[in-house]
Amino acid sequence: MNKIKNLKNSTILYLSLIILLSLTFTFYSGYRGIFPIDSFLIFDAGFKILNGYQPFKDYWSITGPFLDYFQYLFFKMFGVNWTSYVLHAGTINIILSLTTFYFFLNIGLKKIHSCIYSISIAILGYPSVGTPFMDHHATIFSLLSLMTLILALKKDYYYYWFSLPLLLGFSFFSKQIPSAYLSILFLITILIYLAIKKFRKISNVIYLFYGFVSLILICSSIIIINDIPIKNILTQYIFYPISIGKERSLYLNFNFNNIFSQFKFIYFSLLPLIFPIYYLIKIKVKKYQNLIDILILFTFLLSVIIFLYSQLMTKNQILIFFIIPFCLGMTHYYIINYCKNKKLIFLLLFLIIISTLKFHIRFNIDKKFMELSGVDFSLAQPGQILDQK
């Protein structure tokens, strides 16, 4: 009885710590400098909806209607002020961090390790920008959808299948990529999964369809209630971004720095996977769980490639370094299940500490994502000079 009580208390302690750090780092970053266009983009959109304007109908919108409506809700509940704006980002950061903790616990990592990876994500996730931003929302919800798919493949619970289309939809309506690419990959993964199960137990996958229908109903309700023309949505959110994407893809620079150097810590986090992959290949008679783990491994690695490609397509500062803790956590899972080398676990923990410190300094303190590197923050003026809110 005391053991159960201690377990509950330790879980509550971990969850409280993750929530506290998720909010603290986001608020620290959100109040540390602004970049006029990017910092106020979603603020303005949420304020427009609060005043009766609708995206696509009353103002041009090529990215982020999900953010616009979500920010509207925060303004409605907490008032039009910077605190409710940063709280929006902090809330998403909490969701990401807590889901990461839950995910790693459910695939078999210890609480302390799950907590370490979750805290790292809490520090490197939304704090890199500090205020709501479409690229962060899109990448975060895409990462959440990847976690959900992995849990669905391992646990086969209906609520994971149901949630998957919703999370992909939230990501897509934050920004079109990476969810558009991930949807294709996930569909292929699900078909292979069904083939492994010989199409016998597909009842839970039906909930995937229910989730998709629910997403369609939510979107349709918003469109009908607000009388938003479908033609405007297609023009602004589908056709125009496709034309931009085609042009950008033609001029992508696949040099060493773009492909390898700037993402080296992501590759470092994946490098130890060589050992469990070797052991997986050596297994002559692969059991059902081995096949599922192989499927998850390839889906995970291809998803990382999609995240990298999407980052290159944004032509923006790098934001995906918060997938490093996730990559290390996945590597951790395969090591303890197929390699069982404690030295490699210490290597992973060393990498998580180094990468978290490095990118916390670069993005949260120096604010590189907001183009504020080298700025003397001692000369900063309080925002109340412009507006008390």
Model-derived features: positions:
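Short acidic/glycine- and proline-prone juxtamembrane loop motifs at membrane-interface regions
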Residues: G130-A138
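Transmembrane-helix signature of polytopic, membrane-embedded enzymes
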Residues: T100-L124
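Hydrophobic, aromatic-rich transmembrane alpha-helices
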Residues: K264-D293, L297-F300, V304, G329-Y334
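Extracytoplasmic catalytic/substrate-binding loops of multi-pass membrane glycan-assembly enzymes
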Residues: G30-A45, F56-Q71, V80-T83, I228
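Membrane-interface transmembrane helices that cradle and orient dolichyl/undecaprenyl
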Residues: N106-G108, S145-F162, S171, F199, ...
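Specific aromatic-rich, kink-prone transmembrane helix
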Residues: A138-K155, Y160-G169, L187-L194, F326-M330
